[in-house]
């Protein structure tokens, strides 16, 4: 059976409307149901576009984690498995640039939980504010999980069962961003047959929103907007929260 899509989207300026319209026919072929939960600041136009196209779309609360939780909860209510979670802007980029890859990974699964990570090439498309801080978190998480090499635990893309999603919904959220790492660790530890797949389609999706600005300024100059001090502070805050989440699992392992 086709999976249920559980997804979240933050788009305050409705920049992705044309891409949503273009790519929805492809997504309709891949997913049995399409659920998208929006951040509280996402534009009303985006909500209207999604509903018009047949998505089950609604707003989440102000916290980032609550938006993810609502998407997973609505997916579990469908009583259909598996559930495929991917941030919606990433999914739009994936299906527009690597449609065959997306179709392949969504239509066949031999694991009760599949963690999707970025290939080395896909990871390097992101700005250093992201690659450098995430490398620290991924290295620590990979050691906690006993991987022989560092894996991209932060792709925030998973194929999972409803029972696993329900466990995430019940899990305690201890800080703002730690769930990005806490959840995949929990899913992997509590799965009987977990799998890991690296994909090209999870390359950096943000440029899709800013094609006009990129055309005017040039790609390298535009990308510098994500290398400023404000962005470094944001990414370091995320890293701090994720390290706290990892510490919880290290303490748990020691106690057992």
Predicted regions and their residues:
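C-terminal catalytic/acceptor-binding lobe
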Residues: 177, 181-256
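Short beta-strand-to-loop acidic/aromatic patch adjacent to the donor-nucleotide binding site
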Residues: 80-93
């Amino acid at each position: 059976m086709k999976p249920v899509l559980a997804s979240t989207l933050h788009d305050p300026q409705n920049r992705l409307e044309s891409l949503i319209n273009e790519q929805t026919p492809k997504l309709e072929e891949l997913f049995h149901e399409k659920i998208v939960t929006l951040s509280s600041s996402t534009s009303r136009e985006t909500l209207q576009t999604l509903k018009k196209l047949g998505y089950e779309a609604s707003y989440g609360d102000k916290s980032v984690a609550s938006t993810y939780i609502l998407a997973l909860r609505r997916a579990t209510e469908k009583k259909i498995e598996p559930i495929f979670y991917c941030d919606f802007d990433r999914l739009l980029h994936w299906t527009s640039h690597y449609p065959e890859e997306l179709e392949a990974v969504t239509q066949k699964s031999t694991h009760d939980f599949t963690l999707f990570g970025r290939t080395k090439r896909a990871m390097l498309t992101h700005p250093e504010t992201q690659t450098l801080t995430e490398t620290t978190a991924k290295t620590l998480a990979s050691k906690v999980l006993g991987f022989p090499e560092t894996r991209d635990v932060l792709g925030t893309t998973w194929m999972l069962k409803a029972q696993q999603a329900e466990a995430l919904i019940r899990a305690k959220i201890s800080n703002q961003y730690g769930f990005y790492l806490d959840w995949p660790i929990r899913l992997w530890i509590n799965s009987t047959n977990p799998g890991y797949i690296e994909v090209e389609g999870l390359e950096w999706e943000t440029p899709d929103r800013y094609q006009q600005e990129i055309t005017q300024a040039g790609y390298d100059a535009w990308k510098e907007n994500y290398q400023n001090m404000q962005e470094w502070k944001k990414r370091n805050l995320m890293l701090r929260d994720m390290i706290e989440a990892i510490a919880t699992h290290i303490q748990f392992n020691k106690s057992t």
